[in-house]
Design a protein with these regions (language model features):
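Conserved N-terminal beta-strand and adjoining loop/helix that marks the start
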Residues: 36-40
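Intrinsically disordered, low-complexity boundary segments flanking structured domains
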Residues: 1-5, 52-55
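Catalytic strand-loop segment that frames the active site of acyl-thioester-processing enzymes
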Residues: 2-35
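Generic structural detector for well-ordered beta-strands
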Residues: 12-18, 69, 111-113
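Hydrophobic beta-strand-centered segment that forms part of the acyl-chain substrate-binding groove
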Residues: 49-81
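Short, residue-level hotspots on alpha-helical faces of the histone-fold
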Residues: 41-45, 49
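HotDog/MaoC-like acyl-thioester-processing domains
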Residues: 75-76, 85-129
């Protein structure tokens, strides 16, 4: 990674809630509301999008930790928007403050941590195990 990643960079991601994004999709006894795993995934994409301009050829960013609260329900047809803002980093980890909104309320917030890796090097190390 040759480019310095500045604090305050922002990324966004959004999706319209469909049945496949709901608890009910996974279990018919649960309500058809937006699932926490889908919200977290969208928050991760927002953070990944923030990092894209700073990655060198062959690099990707991967999630390494999450600490998120799901605070309000969201129903099918609602648009969920997430934003990630880089709050801190060291040589290895990038910590983003993340929020999710459904147009009516904040539905989630917390932090996600990402690291930059080279998938080819990871595969090479894994093959040696």
């Amino acid at each position: 990674m040759a480019k310095k990643v500045p604090l305050g960079i922002r990324g966004q991601a959004e999706e319209t809630v469909e049945h496949k994004h709901t608890l009910n999709h996974h279990h018919d006894k649960l309500p058809a509301i937006y699932s926490t795993p889908n919200m977290i995934g969208l928050m991760e994409w927002a953070a990944a999008n923030a990092m894209l301009p700073f990655l060198d050829e062959g690099e990707i960013s991967v999630g390494t930790a999450i600490n998120v609260e799901h605070r309000a329900p969201t129903t099918i047809g609602d648009l969920v928007k997430t934003e990630a803002v880089l709050e801190s980093h060291n040589e290895r980890f990038y910590i983003f403050r993340v929020t999710a909104h459904n147009g009516k309320a904040e539905i989630g917030r917390g932090t996600v941590t990402r690291a930059i890796v080279n998938p080819a090097k990871v595969a090479e190390r894994h093959a040696k195990r």
